[in-house]
Amino acid sequence: MPSSSSHPSTPDAPQRVGVELARCACTVRVVRDDDLPAITAIYAHHVRTGTASFEEVPPDDTEMRARCAKVLDAGLPYLVAERDGKLLGYAYATHYRPRSAYRFTLEDSVYIAPDAIGQGVGRTLLLTLIARCEGGPWRQLIANVGDSGNTASLGLHAACGFVQAGVLKSVGFKFGRWIDTVLMQRPLNAGDTTLPE
């Protein structure tokens, strides 16, 4: 698996990350430049058809490349799942907020290709992402789930050790209706039981 010294590394083998890793016949690896067209297409599908993302116009390939580079340049994990050369989904972490007191908190994003939903890809990606995040100094991982009716994402995060931390009512408006966001949270490493070094 390609890695860089600036990115936390963990083995490719399935790991225990608070819960048992789902069995998915796929390979999880670090993103490569040639993955971006498929990533752009997957995200565009979710922007156009769902409420997981509050974007309403899908970003183009140039914008998606810039976003990916920003994650990697920050030393944060950006992963893809593939099977037989086909990209099934992707997941990455970003800093939760830009102000310095948030420096030990990350936010996750997970998007799955429409024809790979329900195959354990999301769980495999998210658990691997959690393991990568635990390879760094971070202490909390936040999921900002678009739409309180998004049972797939809520269930995925709950299965991976997240708990609901709050609901922001009607903060989005898409497809002619108001949409909530659900904040979910999971500790990384020792969480808040110890002070960071």
UniProtKB/Swiss-Prot annotation:
GO terms for biological process: response to antibiotic; response to herbicide. The keyword Iron does not apply. Belongs to the acetyltransferase family. PAT/BAR subfamily. Residues 26-189 form the N-acetyltransferase domain. It is an enzyme of class 2 (transferase). Transmembrane segments: none annotated. The gene is pat. PROSITE patterns: GNAT. This is Phosphinothricin N-acetyltransferase. Acetyl-CoA binds at V110, Y111, I112, G118, Q119, G120, V121, G122, R123, N150. Keywords: Acyltransferase, Antibiotic resistance, Herbicide resistance, Transferase. Its EC number is 2.3.1.183. It catalyses: phosphinothricin + acetyl-CoA = N-acetylphosphinothricin + CoA + H(+). PANTHER family: ACYLTRANSFERASE FABY-RELATED (PTHR43072:SF8), N-ACETYLTRANSFERASE (PTHR43072). The lineage of its organism: Bacteria, Pseudomonadati, Pseudomonadota, Betaproteobacteria, Burkholderiales. It comes from the Bacteria. One of its GO terms (molecular function) is phosphinothricin N-acetyltransferase activity. Inactivates phosphinothricin (PPT) by transfer of an acetyl group from acetyl CoA. This enzyme is an effector of phosphinothricin tripeptide (PTT or bialaphos) resistance. The keyword Acyltransferase applies. InterPro entries: Acyl_CoA_acyltransferase, GNAT_dom. It comes from Alcaligenes faecalis.
